[in-house]
């Protein structure tokens, strides 16, 4: 590790194979917490290369506990987090709206590191069971159209990193990796990233896979469609700038999509929206993101996807998916 750190501090880069080996070494407990923290810190101070990101991704996918949900042709809605915006849990809320529209969802998530409340914090608070049992996950996706894949259960090799990330409490390259390492290997993916540079890296790596994908970055910094400004969208066949008008709605103010200051208030926002008690701004931003997931899965326009998402939310189907998942979690 000493030699590696010296190279990285001297602005050298490492190869894909070397990046893979670092993750393998971390998983085998070869580095102490201080060394891991130093390694993560280097990548907060310099850009990651595509080769390095690819190596880290490949190692995590090789080491993860895999679950085969390929029969469901599911989509994952997952953001990198780390955008510093402290919105409510847009991707998680949008996942239930997507499920309510009849699109199967394999939602990858984790506890918050740089935010008050990550996807898993809210799901856990609301009584959603975390399991790596394939039978349980299939039952969830069959009956509720959605299953929750809590990252630590599927990436045990990374147990040594969790406490370090928590104590650092800022985004690290593991934020960049989260959406790439879903253990169900979903064929459809809506991924939000915290920078334009990372959006381009994702596009480069995804174009060499069989994924059907849409990568999003709001130009004012959000790792999702915020409707507070324009959003860069990169998919298999196109690059475009999305505006609020593409979904038939008006632009929002940033304060209108602010998150709760605690897990409890974040959970309340999510359930209120699904119950039909959300503000128009909250409903629109959720339907825009769910709409893009639906559009990605069903090969339709953002406007058409938005209409399906809105119907899912307003008809109560989104809340039904949530209630079914809650009920399955109690058995």
Curated annotation (Swiss-Prot):
Keyword Acyltransferase in record: no
Entry binding sites for anthranilate 2: 165
Gene Ontology terms for molecular function: anthranilate phosphoribosyltransferase activity; magnesium ion binding
Pathway(s) the chain acts in: Amino-acid biosynthesis; L-tryptophan biosynthesis; L-tryptophan from chorismate: step 2/5
Chain positions recorded as Mg(2+) 1 binding sites: 91, 224
Binding annotation for 5-phospho-alpha-D-ribose 1-diphosphate: 79, 82-83, 87, 89-92, 107-115, 119
Cofactors, names only: Mg(2+)
Binding site for anthranilate 1: 79, 110
The keyword RNA-binding is annotated on this UniProt entry: no
Keywords: Amino-acid biosynthesis, Aromatic amino acid biosynthesis, Glycosyltransferase, Magnesium, Metal-binding, Transferase, Tryptophan biosynthesis
EC number: 2.4.2.18
Organism domain of life: Bacteria
Residues noted as binding Mg(2+) 2 in the record, renumbered to the chain: 223-224
Record family assignment: Belongs to the anthranilate phosphoribosyltransferase family.
Function summary: Catalyzes the transfer of the phosphoribosyl group of 5-phosphorylribose-1-pyrophosphate (PRPP) to anthranilate to yield N-(5'-phosphoribosyl)-anthranilate (PRA).
Subunit field text: Homodimer.
Designated name of the protein: Anthranilate phosphoribosyltransferase
High-level lineage: Bacteria, Pseudomonadati, Bacteroidota, Flavobacteriia, Flavobacteriales
């Amino acid at each position: 590790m000493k030699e590696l750190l010296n190279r990285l501090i001297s602005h050298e880069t490492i190869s894909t194979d070397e990046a893979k080996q670092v993750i393998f070494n971390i998983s085998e407990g070869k580095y102490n917490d201080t060394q891991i923290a130093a390694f993560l810190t280097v990548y907060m101070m310099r850009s990651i290369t595509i080769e390095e990101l690819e190596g880290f991704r490949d190692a995590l996918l090789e080491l993860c506990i895999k679950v085969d949900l390929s029969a469901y042709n599911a989509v994952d809605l997952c953001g990198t987090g780390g955008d510093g915006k402290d919105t409510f849990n847009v991707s998680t809320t949008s996942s239930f709206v997507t499920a309510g529209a009849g699109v199967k969802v394999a939602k990858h998530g984790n506890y918050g590191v740089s935010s008050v409340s990550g996807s898993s914090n809210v799901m856990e608070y609301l009584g959603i069971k975390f399991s790596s049992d394939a039978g349980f996950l299939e039952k969830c996706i069959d009956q509720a159209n959605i299953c929750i894949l809590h990252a630590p259960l599927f990436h045990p090799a990374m147990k040594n990193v969790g406490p370090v990330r928590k104590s650092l409490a800022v985004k690290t390259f593991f934020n960049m990796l989260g959406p790439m390492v879903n253990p169900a290997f979903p064929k459809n993916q809506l991924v939000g990233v915290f920078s334009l540079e990372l959006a381009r890296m994702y596009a480069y790596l995804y174009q060499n896979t069989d994924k059907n994908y849409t990568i999003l970055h709001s130009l004012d910094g959000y790792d999702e469609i915020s409707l507070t400004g324009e959003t860069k969208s990169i998919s298999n066949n196109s690059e475009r700038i999305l505006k609020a008008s593409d979904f038939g709605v008006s632009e929002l103010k940033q304060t209108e999509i602010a998150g709760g200051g605690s897990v409890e208030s974040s959970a309340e926002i999510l359930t209120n929206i699904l119950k039909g008690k959300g503000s128009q701004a909250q409903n629109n931003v959720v339907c825009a993101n769910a709409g893009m997931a639906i559009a990605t899965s069903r090969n339709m326009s953002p406007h058409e996807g938005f209409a399906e998402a809105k119907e899912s939310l307003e008809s109560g189907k989104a809340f039904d998916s949530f209630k079914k998942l809650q009920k399955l979690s109690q058995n």
